[in-house]
Structures are given as structure tokens and as C-alpha cells.
């Protein structure tokens, strides 16, 4: 897959070129994006000026906006109004508009939904999906309250949080649709009665879009910060806070940083089925070792199901910060980093990922090389893989994993050899005579063949 490309290879694109084309069976009938994540200024479309044409034919006519988003500005009064509103006289004096022209504004999707529904809180991580025709932004909306009875406040601001709605924003037209994700949430039900028609049932979302829904990362992070204390169900242990957790720690540069939850595809819950999961590695509070993994299901059928995998408390499992230290002190990796980290270039280590696999923990970290000039285009150079005390760096994941397994097998062979007692060679017979039996102890005492046993020998 493109996600498993080799180091030093050029980046592999899922979609590329204009018009977009794909080597991975991705199709998109309308690739235009008028609403996105940046702080876009207003836009007037369609107009008498051609827009960028998505056609591969260089002689093809330019394209024009054909959506229903925005506000028509065919009259002088509206042009004057928006010219004053945006403090831009070009809106009033331009001669490039026509009777079909519309002004598009609030084109940042977060600003758009916050303006429409200021009583909802939104996830900071909108993501784009496709139904093979248009592009859509999906956002998670929350209802909150600081007044929920008998609930501990979080961060001093709220003690009630529900992922009440999934919000869909059409990237072409800007149309916003709210789908009720939690029908049992009393706050969203109250808003539904206040604003009839605001929320649609989740079943009304297109199936090809509903398959892209995922468990919200911000919600899961809040849940894990609370669960870090309340996973202790024994009263004495909870009272003494003997097993309080925190997010596993790593380093970014010289600064310690948490490994917050991230999305992965694993067969962790069912060995016969790969699933899209949200994973959080957890460590004991104040320690660098790994204590457990918590995963939330994102696929249909397991959506929202949270599972915890504990490591035995007496077993030491290296945490990400300890693996970071092993990487730093590996002489072969250090030599490579020193060679690359010369004038004009800099090494940047990517996010360290924790993967449970085959009954053990595997760490993976990409290594990028980037320019120190103004224009920085990071290039994937190497992949670091680690298991136990061993760290390996190679150009791709498969080669690195194979080398790592070889070193682990060599380590196991050395341990097996150390456990076996050294055999004492028997003297060769002279002229066909039988070897002489060792003297000092009769046969049957456990010292046959000259093998020494006993604390004084």
C-alpha cells in the first residue's frame, strides 16, 4: 500500500495531477473544494473569469462554479452591502460578475458550523471523505454541561460530554447536515425540539459515507484521562492510587511529549479480521514503562466498543521513551544520523507508533530528511523498528522487521546455549582399548563420565 513505501523512494500519491487520477481505484467526479480547513477569504463564483479547468485537454474551456452555495449578488444593493461588510470596494465596482454570481464566505468548515450551532462543541480534527462523486468534511459535535449531578468535573469546565451528532459539510456547496449520533442524549433532544429539522437520524446518511465514521479522538482522549484513575476498581487500590496511569511518553527533540491516541488498522480484537481502531498506549504515572493498551472500535458492529489490554504488573515492558533512548544510543543509527545531519539538511524523526503483534510489542518510527532552508520537503529515509532490547533501522518495514527477527533469534540461541551444560569429551581409545573410568567415586553417584556436581567442586 502507499502507506508502506520504502525509504528514499518518491512519495506515493493516492490522488494526483489535474484532473485527479489514481492508481488505487479511487474515483472522484467532482474534485473541486470551495470549503475547507484554511482561513479562506470570500469568493465570488461563477464569474466572467474562467476558473481552473479540471480537464486534461489544454484547449478545454475553463470551468465555472455550478453549486447552490453562497448568496446571490446580482443587485447593486447586495454588492454595496457586502462591500461594506467585508470592507472591500472591489465587490461593488467589479465588472466581472454576472446574473448567476454568488458570494461564498465562512468557507472554513469549523467557523461555518460554529456560526450555525454555537451551542455545540466541535472536534478539532475534521477529515475529508468521498462518495466517489463529491468530497465531504465530517466533524464530530458534542453536547456538554458543567451541571451533571454526582459527576466529577474534567479540567474544571465540564462534567458531561456526549458525541451527540455527526456533521457533514459538502466541500463544493458548503451545505451543512447534522445527523443525530446519540438518540439518548437529553441535551441534543432538547435542541431537536427547539429547532425542528436541525437533526436527521444517522440512518439517513448515505451508506458509503456512514462507513467512514470513526470514533472521535478528542472524546477518547478525555475518556482515557479519566479512566487512568478509575480503572482501579478495588477500593484500597483506588484510595491509595497504586496503579494510576498516564499517556505513554516519548520525546520530540529534547522535549518530553505524550503519545495521544492514534488510528491504526489491526487484527487485535479478532485475529481473523482487520479493523480500524483508535489506540492509546498507557504507562504507570511517573514511570516510562508500558502498562497497557486501550483500543476503541471504529468499524460498524464494534463502533464505540472500548477494550483494555493489561500487561502483567510484575513484567517490565519498555515504553516509547525507553525505546527512544535505545535508538539514541545505538551506534550504527547514531553514525547514520550524524552523516545526514550536516549543513543544509536536518533529521526529523516521525511519530513513534506502538503495535501489539504476535503476543509482543513492536515499535515503529519513520525517519525523515529535510532541508534547513525556507523550502522544506521532508523525504522518508529510513524506518526504525524495535522489539525488546533490539533496535534496527532499514529502508523499509519488511527488511527492518526481518533483520529484527534475525537478531532476536540469535539472542534466543545464545540464551539456549548458555542454559545447556558443557559436555566433557571422553578420551579416545588406545589400540581399541576401552576408556578408563574416572577415579574417586563409584558409579551410580551422579558423577559418571566425569561430570562435576556439588558446591565444593
What name fits each language-model region?
Residues 1-457:
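Soluble extracytoplasmic regions of secretory-pathway and membrane proteins
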Amino acid at each position: 500500500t502507499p502507506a508502506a513505501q520504502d525509504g528514499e523512494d518518491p512519495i506515493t500519491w493516492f490522488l494526483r495531477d489535474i484532473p485527479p487520477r489514481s492508481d488505487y481505484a479511487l474515483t472522484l467526479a467532482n474534485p473541486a473544494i470551495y470549503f475547507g480547513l484554511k482561513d479562506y477569504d470570500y469568493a465570488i463564483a461563477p464569474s466572467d473569469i474562467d476558473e481552473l479547468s479540471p480537464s486534461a485537454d489544454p484547449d478545454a474551456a475553463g470551468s465555472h462554479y455550478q453549486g447552490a452555495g453562497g448568496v446571490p449578488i446580482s443587485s447593486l444593493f447586495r454588492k454595496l452591502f457586502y462591500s461594506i461588510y467585508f470592507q472591500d470596494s472591489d465587490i461593488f465596482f467589479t465588472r466581472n460578475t454576472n446574473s448567476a454570481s454568488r458570494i461564498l464566505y465562512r468557507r472554513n468548515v469549523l467557523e461555518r458550523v460554529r456560526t450555525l450551532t454555537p451551542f455545540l462543541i466541535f472536534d478539532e480534527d475534521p477529515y475529508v471523505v468521498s462518495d466517489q462523486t463529491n468530497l465531504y468534511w465530517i466533524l464530530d459535535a458534542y453536547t456538554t454541561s458543567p451541571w451533571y449531578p454526582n459527576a466529577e468535573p474534567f479540567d474544571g469546565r465540564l462534567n458531561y460530554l456526549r458525541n451527540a451528532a455527526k456533521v457533514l459539510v459538502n466541500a463544493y456547496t458548503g451545505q451543512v447536515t447534522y445527523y443525530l449520533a446519540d438518540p439518548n442524549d437529553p441535551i441534543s433532544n432538547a435542541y431537536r425540539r427547539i429547532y425542528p429539522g436541525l437533526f436527521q437520524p444517522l440512518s439517513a446518511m448515505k451508506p458509503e459515507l456512514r462507513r467512514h465514521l470513526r470514533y472521535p479522538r478528542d472524546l477518547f482522549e478525555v475518556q482515557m484521562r479519566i479512566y487512568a484513575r478509575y480503572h482501579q476498581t478495588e477500593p484500597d487500590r483506588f484510595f491509595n492510587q497504586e496503579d494510576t496511569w498516564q499517556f505513554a511518553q516519548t520525546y520530540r527533540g529534547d522535549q518530553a511529549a505524550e503519545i495521544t491516541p492514534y488510528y491504526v488498522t489491526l487484527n487485535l480484537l479478532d485475529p481473523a479480521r482487520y479493523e480500524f481502531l483508535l489506540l492509546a498506549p498507557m504507562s504507570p504515572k511517573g514511570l516510562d514503562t508500558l502498562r497497557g493498551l486501550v483500543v476503541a472500535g471504529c468499524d460498524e458492529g464494534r463502533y464505540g466498543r472500548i477494550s483494555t489490554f493489561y500487561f502483567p504488573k510484575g513484567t517490565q515492558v519498555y515504553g516509547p521513551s525507553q525505546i527512544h533512548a535505545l535508538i539514541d544510543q545505538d551506534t550504527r543509527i547514531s553514525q547514520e544520523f550524524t552523516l545526514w545531519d550536516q549543513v543544509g539538511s536536518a533529521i526529523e524523526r516521525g511519530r513513534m507508533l506502538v503495535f501489539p503483534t504476535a503476543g509482543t510489542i513492536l515499535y515503529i518510527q519513520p525517519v525523515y530528511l529535510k532541508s534547513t532552508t525556507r523550502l522544506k520537503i521532508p523525504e522518508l529515509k529510513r524506518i526504525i523498528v524495535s522489539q525488546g532490547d533490539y533496535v534496527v533501522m532499514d529502508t523499509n518495514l519488511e527488511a527492518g522487521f526481518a533483520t529484527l527477527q534475525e537478531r532476536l533469534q540469535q539472542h534466543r540461541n545464545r540464551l539456549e546455549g548458555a542454559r545447556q551444560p558443557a559436555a566433557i569429551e571422553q578420551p579416545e581409545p588406545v589400540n581399541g582399548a576401552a576408556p578408563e573410568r574416572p577415579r574417586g567415586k563409584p558409579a551410580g553417584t551422579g558423577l559418571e563420565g566425569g561430570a562435576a556436581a556439588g558446591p565444593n567442586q
